[in-house]
Amino acid sequence: MTTEPLALDFKSATLYAIRVVLHSADPDQLAEALGRRMADAGSFFENEAVVIDASRVSAPIDWPALVKALGAHKLPVIGVVAENGNLERARAAGLIPVELSAPRTQQSVDPAPPNHVSTPVPAAPEASRAAQEQLRSAMKGDAQAVPTRAARDTTEAASHTPAAPQSSTALVITKPLRSGQRVYARHTDLVVIGMVSQGAEVIADGNIHVYGPLRGKAMAGARGDTSARIFTTHLDAELLAVAGVYRVVEDRLDRNLHNQPALVRLNGDTLHIEALKS
C-alpha cells in the first residue's frame, strides 16, 4: 500500500454567486437590461460567478447568446435554474443545472430612484434603536460598543426567512480597507472598525456595521436576507445594496446624510437611507 499523497483530493466548498433573474427571453431586452444594470453598478459585480434563474420564463431562451452577453460584462456563468424545455436547452448548451435551496424573499433588484431618500422614521423598530445606541457609543469612543451580533426587527424576522443560517459571531475587521480590497462575511454580520476606502467592498450575509467613513461599496443580506441592514458612522458610499436591491450614489447625499451616521434598510422594494441622530 502506497503512502504517497494522491494528485487530488475532495474538499467541501461554498461558493458566493450572483443570481441573475430573467423576466424575459428576448435577447435584445436582456442585453439592454444587462447593460443598464452593469452601468449602474460600475465594477461592483465584475468577475462574480453567476447563476442564471430562468424559472419565471417559459419562452425559449438563447442560452449561448445570453452566456456570451454576460461574459462580455465579466460575469462567468456557473449554473442555471430552469424548467422544462429551457432546462433541456441549457443542458444542450453545456450549462449545469443547480438548485437554489433557499429562494430569496425579496424578488426585486430594481435600484431605488436616484434622488430618493426616506425621512427618519419617528417610531423606529427595536433593531434600529439598538443600532442607534451602538453608533452613539462608537462616536463617543466607547470601544466596548462594537456588537458581536446585531439585533433584528422581530416583526421582520417573523415575516422574512433569512436565505442562509446566520452565525452567532460577527466577522470583525480592525483596520482600514484600502481601494481594491474586499471582505465577505459568510453567514454572519460584518463589523469594520475603520475606514472603508473608495474602491473597497464590504459584503455580508447579515448586517454591515462600519465604525468609520464608508466610502466604498457595501452589500448586506448578500444571500437574500431582506431584514439585513447597513449601519455607519460616516456615510459617503459609492454603492449600497440590501438583498440585491441596490443604489449607486452618483450625487452627493442630502446634508443630513452625507458624512453623517446613517442606517440603510429595505422597505418593500425600495432602499431607504435614514439619518441616525446622536
From Swiss-Prot:
Name of this chain's protein: Probable septum site-determining protein MinC
Superkingdom of the organism of origin: Bacteria
Cited function: Cell division inhibitor that blocks the formation of polar Z ring septums. Rapidly oscillates between the poles of the cell to destabilize FtsZ filaments that have formed before they mature into polar Z rings. Prevents FtsZ polymerization.
Family statement: Belongs to the MinC family.
Keyword terms: Cell cycle, Cell division, Septation
Lineage, top ranks: Bacteria, Pseudomonadati, Pseudomonadota, Betaproteobacteria, Burkholderiales
Region of interest (Disordered), residue spans: 104-167
Organism of derivation: Bordetella avium (strain 197N)
Pfam family, one: MinC_C
SUPFAM superfamilies linked to this entry: Cell-division inhibitor MinC, C-terminal domain
NCBIfam families: minC
Subunit structure: Interacts with MinD and FtsZ.
Gene3D superfamilies named among the record's database cross-references: 2.160.20.70, 3.30.70.260
InterPro entries noted in UniProt: CAP/MinC_C (IPR016098), MinC (IPR013033), MinC_C_sf (IPR036145), MinC_N (IPR007874), Septum_form_inhib_MinC_C (IPR005526)
GO biological process, one term: regulation of cell division
